Amino acid sequence: MTHQTHAYHMVNPSPWPLTGALSALLMTSGLIMWFHFNSTALLMLGLTTNMLTMYQWWRDIIRESTFQGHHTPVVQKGLRYGMILFIISEVLFFTGFFWAFYHSSLAPTPELGGCWPPTGINPLNPLEVPLLNTSVLLASGVSITWAHHSLMEGNRSHMLQALFITITLGVYFTLLQASEYYEAPFTISDGVYGSTFFVATGFHGLHVIIGSTFLIVCFFRQLKFHFTSNHHFGFEAAAWYWHFVDVVWLFLYVSIYWWGS
């Protein structure tokens, strides 16, 4: 590596943005093939290439940050700003779903029967599985904070315990959500209620799966002693993302499950 007189990371050429874009194209095309022709071959190819890209891209980042020391305090500051902007973009993403829900529910059209929920829709009881899901996610928010504080204090065993609990709660939430979808008395095809419900809660569920993946990677990195009390941005970003997922669920629960029912 040539000598440099600044603290910034000059990134080497990487194939992973290109393979990531191609895997995204394969996944979206595969979804269309699955929906219209009941063929999952292209979707499986897209998911496989996406998983391989994630593994190899994260492997390179871990090498650069943990072993080569490229993630200086200046670089970490830039990464923090990037993560904050990413979470802001996610807030705007979910704002569109809430807008669609409230636009439809605050002034129901005559086609919906002039009421909300629309005529013929039996909404889910907000005090059953949705309330359990809320308590599960809130508990995971507590455990991820415990993990963060343990890491800052250098308590490795407590950090691993708390992170394992958080991952377990995330997987439990996903299983509860899947069972709720399976038993729901309406589908995504049941008008604007079904579409807004399943799109909003479905994208949130996808974000829970993504966040759980981040935390699983952090768990294995911690097993290999990658994090220290002053060098752990990978975990910090995953924790921020998890708290964002928590807050979005609270808005979903209050809006769609409780008020919307």
Swiss-Prot record:
Matching Gene3D superfamilies: 1.10.287.70, Cytochrome c oxidase, subunit III, four-helix bundle
What gene codes for this chain? MT-CO3
State the name under which the record lists this protein: Cytochrome c oxidase subunit 3
Its membrane topology is listed as: Multi-pass membrane protein
Q: Does the keyword DNA-binding apply?
A: no
Name the cystine pairs: none
What family is reported?
Belongs to the cytochrome c oxidase subunit 3 family.
Q: Which GO terms describe its biological process?
A: mitochondrial electron transport, cytochrome c to oxygen; respiratory chain complex IV assembly
Gene Ontology CC: one annotated term: mitochondrial inner membrane
Q: Provide the reaction this enzyme catalyses.
A: 4 Fe(II)-[cytochrome c] + O2 + 8 H(+)(in) = 4 Fe(III)-[cytochrome c] + 2 H2O + 4 H(+)(out)
